[in-house]
Amino acid sequence: IESVDSIELAEKIARRAVMRGITVGVLLEVNESGEASKSGCPASHAIDLAQRIGNMGGLQLQGLMTIGAHVSDETTIRAGFAHLRKTRDQILASGAPGTEHCTELSMGMTGDMELAIAEGATIVRVGTGIFGERAFI
């Protein structure tokens, strides 16, 4: 699940996973751009939330996810991706229990995937590049 953005959501998923006797891989969604139109926890809370999620039964924290800033300035977009990578590195370096699998960086979509890859993305989301623009009817 790539869009866990709060402790409350993580706890709900964890409870259901434990009831079913499974472990669910999750990515913590971080709002690196600070844009109100985007989901995700504030970047300043990411390390604490990651460590708390890592301690939950039924979940395996596998990485972080963000959507790049919706701006034309590549420097701004890259800065958000670079910050997410640094945050991931800090989480891993902390050695906190349950964070050792926090290796994935899901960042970058069709329009900014090259920037994301340059900043260390391990997962990119390229739906528009494959399927074309969405048709809103």
PLM feature segments, named:
Residues 1-113, 119, 131-133:
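Conserved alpha/beta-domain cores
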Residues 123, 136-137:
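Active-site loop ensemble at the mouth of alpha/beta enzyme cores that anchors a bound cofactor
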Residues 120-122, 127:
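Active-site-proximal glycine-rich helix-loop-beta segment
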